[in-house]
Amino acid sequence: KIEKADVLAFMEPVTASAVPEAQEAERIKMKGLRKAVADNMLESAKSIPHVTLTSDVDMTKVIDMRKALLPIVESQTGYRLSFTEIIVKTVAHTLESQPRVNASLDGDEIVINKDVNIGLAVAVEDGLIVPSVKQANKKGLAELTETSKTLGKKARENKLKPVEMQGSTFTITNLGM
């Protein structure tokens, strides 16, 4: 049986629980490579228009081409050709044929870059780092394979030089493919 006291108790305002005090965030002074990467990312965000494109693509012919080229590239470089290098080659060729996409901003000017320098996002312990494959449009698949594998290894070992992280005109990632 429900009595008047039960109804009144139910209707009484509920007191809010105490809000915990905000914790002060930890601040870590950046230096060295981490600072250089942050500076490059900030400059990139300010000067290069950002566009993200995700597409479904039938890669059947690319898979077949890679299978045929694997032994050739590996015998020339000592590295296995991955889809990353094929994507870099395709993007570099496209940017060369569409130079207005290979552009950046400098103040009130649009800069059409003559070099096609592809930034490759590489997962490292503390996040991502983006080494730059210089003049990717002038490299064949074997040279792109050697360059990207070397830069990726140096990135994971924290041995990239600042110049190896500068100058990208376009950045890609294949999301772990």
Model-derived segments and their meaning:
Residues K1-M177:
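C-terminal catalytic/motor cores of large multi-domain enzyme assemblies
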